[in-house]
Structure formats: structure tokens, C-alpha cells
Amino acid sequence: MNSSIFNKLKSLRNRYEEIEIMLSQKDTISNQEKFKNLSKEYLQISEIVKNFIKWEKLETDIKNINLLFNDVEMHDIAQEELFIVKKQKKKLEEKIKILLLPVDPNDQHSCFIEIRAATGGDESSIFAGELFRMYTRYAENYMWKTEIMSSSENERGGFKEIIAKVTGKGACGRLKFESGGHRVQRVPETESQGRIHTSTCTVAIMPVRPKTKKEEIKVSDLKIDTFRSSGAGGQHVNTTDSAIRITHIPSGNVVECQDERSQHKNKAKALSILSARVYADKLAKSQKENSSMRRILLGTGERSDRNRTYNFAQNRITDHRINLTIYKLNEVLQGKLDLLIDPIMQEYQADMLSSLSEFKL
């Protein structure tokens, strides 16, 4: 075993035992904040510690079985027993490796989905609308809530741009692989000669930060403009300056919100999106430290990232990042997105495991 890994596991076990004692002490029980923090840490490391203890027991079992080989009568039994225990040990090693992988703290958070029509005119906007419906149906499968934060509709259907908030545990962890370019190939309804057109949309996934950890944005760094809404809102449309445009001067990020009748609500939505964008920019910089494969899988939400091609004529979706092709386009558009997300997550995990290549228990 890699000595640094072994020492880490021993250290975790010692800490686990230490917390166990502390949780039973009166001064800890009487201090709610301390008790809460220790309980959380205890829960976080308990699974890996329990599996490490099992591994140590299997190591001891193997040593004891090897002693049986000195007895001729026990040789066959020992050989059979050794095979079983080694198999158990190997399976446990793989589990421990996965448990040792760093956990992205944003994976359990909610997220914003930003979909923009890129090349292809009306067809691109229509496809943006279909992508939004796909993500909405996918969210329903996990009982996540979807709320439109900002949208710009296209006259012929779909959206030029739409930003939605997906609220639910684990939303960001599963949807983060959607960032990048999405390409559609099909014959548009307006095409009289039956020619296949190619259009593109970009998707960006931004984690929603907890209120206690939201990016601090200085008011002095913001330029806030109000204007009359041109979207939904009934009789109040174009009668009050309820729409908001906020520019974050240092980064150049601009967010517009006009879906609500209330200027205050539009401002609150715009600020929450802006906070997520500023944080997403920081994440993008930190991802440069990731391996090239992980950067490809996560994407950046830029047009240059080519995630998938959706070919309607062939009922085909190809994910170019892992060379995966499935002929279930209709099912995916109905929300069965795990057909694509699960293989991506497995590839991502495999790449992270490769960084633990020296870890041989």
C-alpha cells in the first residue's frame, strides 16, 4: 500500500474514534454547534473508516490462512479459503478507492441552467426550447423544482435565451456535465426542399451557492439599470420600469430579468444569477488544474465545447466526449437523460481513479 494513503486511512480511523468519544461527553452535548459539526464530520468519514477496518481484518485473515499451508492436510482447504478472501479484499479495495475520491462540495447543491440559441436562427431557438423541456422533465424524475428566472422568447417558438433554477439535492452533481455545445440536425418545418439543417445551442450549468457562502459582490462594482418590460406581466407590461439589468463591472457579466411584475423580485433574481456566474467563473479557472479528460467532460458552456449531436432523422444522439452513440433520442427528450449522464459520470470517476493509480492495497 502507498504509505501516504495508508497513513491517511489510519489518521481517519483515529479521528473517527476521537469524535466517537467526544460525542458522548457532556460539554459536547451541551454545545449544539459543536455537537452538530462533530456529528457531520463523524458521518462523513464513517463509511471509509468502517471499510478500512474490514480491510485490515481481511489482511489478518490472509496471514492466518497462509499459516495453514504448513499443514499438508489443510492445504486444499487453505487454498480455497485464500481465494475467497482475496476476492473479497479486491472488491473492498475498489470500494475504498472510490470513497477516497475528493467530493465536489457543489454536487449536492441546486443549480442554474442557462440555455442560449447560437447558430441557426429560429431553428436554434426552437431547439433551445426543446432542451429546456428535456431538463424540466428530467428534474421531475428526481422531484426537483424548476423555476424560470429569466427568458427571451422567439417569435416563432422556443427561446433566444432562458435561465432556470433547478432546486433539489444533487441537481448540480448530475447536471454539471451538460455545460457546452449541443448540436441539432434535422429538417426544419420551414424547409421546403427537405434539406437537413444544423443548428446549435449552448448550455451552462452554474451551482447555486448557499446563502451563507454566496459570492460577496460589492455594490460599487455593479451598474443597475431599469427599463420597461417587454415580456409577460399582463396590464403592467410597458407601464412601469420593472425590468432590471445588472452589469458586474470587474467581470463584464450582464444579467437581465423582466419576468416578474415586481422590480424588487426581478432585482433579487438578477443578483442571484450574477452571484452564480461570478462563482462559476472562479470554478472555471480552478478547473484548469484538472486533468484534460475531466476538463473535457465538465465543459465550460462555450460554443467551442461540442458535447452532443441530436440527429432527429436517425433518432440518434452522439456524445462526442466519450464517443457514445444511442438511438433513443425521443426517450432522452422526454427526460430519460440518465442514459447519457450515467456513462459520463462513470468516465469522470474512472479518470479521477487513475490519479490514485499508485494506491494498491
Curated annotation (Swiss-Prot):
CC annotations in GO: cytoplasm
Keyword Glycoprotein listed: no
Subcellular location: Cytoplasm
Annotated coiled-coil segments of the chain: none
Keyword Glycosyltransferase attributed: no
Matches recorded under InterPro entries: PCRF, Pep_chain_release_fac_I, Pep_chain_release_fac_I_sf, Prokaryotic/Mito_RF, RF-1
PTM per Swiss-Prot/TrEMBL: Methylated by PrmC. Methylation increases the termination efficiency of RF1.
Modified residues (N5-methylglutamine): 235
Keywords, alphabetical: Cytoplasm, Methylation, Protein biosynthesis
Protein function: Peptide chain release factor 1 directs the termination of translation in response to the peptide chain termination codons UAG and UAA.
Homology family: Belongs to the prokaryotic/mitochondrial release factor family.
Name by which UniProt lists this protein: Peptide chain release factor 1
Native source species: Buchnera aphidicola subsp. Schizaphis graminum (strain Sg)
